[in-house]
Structures are given as structure tokens and as C-alpha cells.
UniProtKB/Swiss-Prot annotation:
Single GO biological process annotation from the record: translation
One Gene Ontology cellular component annotation held by this UniProt entry: cytosolic small ribosomal subunit
InterPro entries named among the record's database cross-references: NA-bd_OB-fold, Ribosomal_uS17, Ribosomal_uS17_bact/chlr, Ribosomal_uS17_CS
SUPFAM superfamilies assigned: Nucleic acid-binding proteins (SSF50249)
Species of the source: Staphylococcus aureus (strain NCTC 8325 / PS 47)
Protein name according to UniProt: Small ribosomal subunit protein uS17
Amino acid sequence: MSERNDRKVYVGKVVSDKMDKTITVLVETYKTHKLYGKRVKYSKKYKTHDENNSAKLGDIVKIQETRPLSATKRFRLVEIVEESVII
């Protein structure tokens, strides 16, 4: 059980929900520049497994690392932190 707790957990925004049971999550992080010490924003997109197609475009979600589910999917949806408001 402790092995599962060592897996990476990220919070990001859903930028695509067009695929069946798959969402694309944009995760933004900050890293410090080695020479200048300035914080620089980095972003990366992760394909994430969404079993019930519950996450929608613009939602803030929590994802967790898991075993490879396909050629590009390595994460699964843990929870929807904040739902987006569609006007």
C-alpha cells in the first residue's frame, strides 16, 4: 500500500475532453533558474484516464501517476477539485 503513496500527484486544468475516457490536463509548475535564481513557469500536458467521463473542459482536477494504460496515458483522475462555470 505504501508504494501507491509514492506516486506523483498533480493538480491541473482540463484543456481537452474530446476523447472517450481520456482528458488532457495542463499542469503548471515553477522551477528556479540555475544561474539567475529567477522562478520560471513551466507547463506540461498529461493524458489522463477518466473512467466515467466526469471531468469537463476548464475543470481543475487532481491526477495521480499509475501504470501505463496506453501508449501515452500514465495518469488517472483522482478527483475534480473545482468545476468550471459554463456561461
